[in-house]
Curated annotation (Swiss-Prot):
The gene is prfC. InterPro entries: EF-G-like_DII, EFG_III/V, G_TR_CS, P-loop_NTPase, PrfC, RF3_C, RF3_dom_3_sf, RF3_GTP-bd. Belongs to the TRAFAC class translation factor GTPase superfamily. Classic translation factor GTPase family. PrfC subfamily. GO terms for biological process: maintenance of translational fidelity; regulation of translational termination; translational termination. Keywords: Cytoplasm, GTP-binding, Nucleotide-binding, Protein biosynthesis. This is Peptide chain release factor RF3. GO terms for cellular component: cytosol. NCBIfam families: prfC, PRK00741.1, small_GTP. It is found in: Cytoplasm. PANTHER family: PEPTIDE CHAIN RELEASE FACTOR RF3 (PTHR43556:SF2). It comes from Escherichia coli (strain K12). Increases the formation of ribosomal termination complexes and stimulates activities of RF-1 and RF-2. It binds guanine nucleotides and has strong preference for UGA stop codons. It may interact directly with the ribosome. The stimulation of RF-1 and RF-2 is significantly reduced by GTP and GDP, but not by GMP.
């Protein structure tokens, strides 16, 4: 049975994101993936070491200075017979809220681990988010050109700490200065590593068969024998790869390599296009939407300001769930119940924009947004339903924001509301005074906000400490009890950027007391958009 042209396009798509701890090599691996997808000709110098060519996926001013990917950009490239969409996730310690939401828009994740360090804190947090939807995970053990921990130990650590079985696909031969290459367990082939070839795709020499004398000649008798001994252990002690268990999020195929040396990345990509799922069904408040449906649906998971400094615009990133986008089509924005004609949607190669004529499930569209689109918005061809599972997370850090020039209050508020709509920060306006309180998940977000207020809104602002420990969104089914709660707690209530009521607690004890005193009021740690 041949698939219709539409279903063939759906079957070709693979949409994934990379999760890692900062400095595990995520930006480098992103570049090498794009290199294999022929999206860039030579891999850029990461963090622009003495050069102007910044890593292709890091592009806001502050990122240029700090060498971190603050924003979540999207890159599409062909690989074998597939079209791959890579959603770049902010790799720095602080950008978790955006990163969490990006993970709601992918069908698969690549976990990058620094093989010298093993599982790190950030990796744990991001894995927890992928667990909410049992997202399939591939694993790349990076930095084999340095001295690493024992590979068996690394697998044990992933299994014990992240509660996912490991199925090694490739196995390293030596490491650091002695790194010779990897052996592919399922193809019975050894791929030999050459150093100093990291910027281009290299011709790799392949030795067939584990007992081939050419292997001993290529890597030395000692390393060849060590490899054979280790593989006996590996085959006895680790999981075999099983595609169904992988798709259920229960085991992860593990690849070894060095992103900087551009070695092993293609093995991982081969596995990704072969095993990762095509666009998956998604839940709405009324039903499940299948990718094969012919009516268009999609949801917004991120809003990005000023992707292009020359254009003062914002772009809403929308994941296509079903149907085909065609230029000029009319879509219903469910939240406002308004129909809009989308004639200028964008697709991305980070930093470069091009207009899209058509897009399919799994693809990410950029919609020009002049303040009318919010995170979590659903677009359909008329059906009134809303995709679920795109949350806001209660901030953990708070500052009061103050203007250097009091006359610019209006611009400040506008800037903060826009920044909160795109998820860069959350803003709370206390009901009882004129303060503006900014909430974030990590400290660096505060710096980003001040820098962006200055460059985009021409507003100079400074922070002051504020006596706020946490915030919870509040609601109550009983209107009378809710009125009483609001009356008695006015000094601790605030409206967020979307005018939702929140309780601002001065301490965790204060929050617990309020929850005990008002059992009918619900205090929410996350809020569905």
């Amino acid at each position: 049975m041949t698939l219709s042209p539409y279903l063939q396009e759906v079957a070709k798509r693979r949409t994934f994101a990379i999760i890692s701890h900062p400095d595990a090599g995520k930006t480098t691996i992103t570049e090498k993936v794009l290199l294999f997808g022929q999206a860039i000709q030579t891999a850029g110098t990461v963090k622009g070491r003495g050069s102007n060519q910044h890593a292709k996926s890091d592009w806001m001013e502050m990122e240029k200075q700090r060498g971190i990917s603050i924003t979540t950009s999207v890159m599409q490239f062909p690989y074998h017979d597939c079209l791959v969409n890579l959603l770049d996730t902010p790799g720095h310690e602080d950008f978790s809220e955006d990163t969490y939401r990006t993970l709601t828009a992918v069908d698969c994740c690549l976990m990058v681990i620094d093989a010298a360090k093993g599982v790190e804190d950030r990796t744990r947090k991001l894995m927890e988010v992928t667990r909410l939807r049992d997202t399939p995970i591939l694993t790349f053990m990076n930095k084999l050109d340095r001295d690493i921990r024992d590979p068996m130990e690394l697998l044990d650590e992933v299994e014990n700490e992240l509660k996912i079985g490991c199925a090694p696909i490739t196995w390293p031969i030596g490491c650091g200065k002695l790194f010779k290459g990897v052996y592919h367990l399922y193809k019975d082939e050894t791929y030999l590593y050459q150093s100093g070839k990291g910027h281009t795709i290299q011709e790799v020499r392949i030795v067939k068969g584990l007992n081939n004398p050419d292997l001993d000649a290529a890597v030395g008798e000692d390393l060849a024998q060590q490899l054979r001994d280790e593989l006996e252990l590996v085959k006895g002690a680790s999981n075999e790869f099983d595609k169904e268990l992988f798709l259920a999020g229960e085991i992860t195929p593990v690849f070894f390599g060095t992103a900087l040396g551009n070695f092993g990345v293609d093995h991982m990509l081969d596995g990704l296009v072969e095993w990762a799922p095509a666009p998956m069904p998604r839940q709405t408040d009324t039903r499940t939407v299948e990718a094969s449906e012919d009516k268009f649906t999609g949801f917004v998971f991120k809003i990005q300001a000023n992707m292009d400094p020359k254009h003062r615009d914002r772009v809403a990133f929308m994941r296509v769930v079903s149907g085909k986008y065609e230029k000029g089509m009319k879509l219903r924005q469910v939240r406002t119940a308004k129909d809009v004609v989308i004639s200028d949607a964008l697709t991305f190669m980070a930093g470069d924009r091009s207009h899209v004529e058509e897009a399919y499930p799994g693809d990410i569209l950029g919609l020009h947004n002049h303040g009318t689109i919010q995170i979590g918005d659903t677009f359909t061809q008329g059906e009134m339903m809303k995709f679920t599972g795109i949350p806001n997370f209660a901030p953990e850090l708070f500052r009061r924001i103050r203007l250097k020039d009091p006359l610019k209050q209006k611009q400040l508020l506008k800037g903060l509301v826009q920044l909160s709509e795109e998820g860069a920060v959350q803003v709370f306006r206390p009901i009882s005074n004129n303060d503006l309180i900014v909430g974030a998940v990590g400290v660096l977000q505060f710096d980003v906000v001040v820098a962006r207020l200055k460059s985009e809104y021409n507003v100079e602002a400074v922070y002051e400490s504020v006596n706020v420990a946490t915030a919870r969104w509040v609601e109550c089914a009983d209107a009378k009890k809710f009125e009483e709660f609001k009356r008695k707690n006015e000094s601790q209530l605030a409206l967020d950027g979307g005018d939702n009521l929140a309780y601002i607690a001065t301490s965790m004890v204060n929050l617990r007391l309020a929850q005990e005193r008002y059992p009918d009021v619900q205090f929410h740690q996350t809020r569905e958009h």
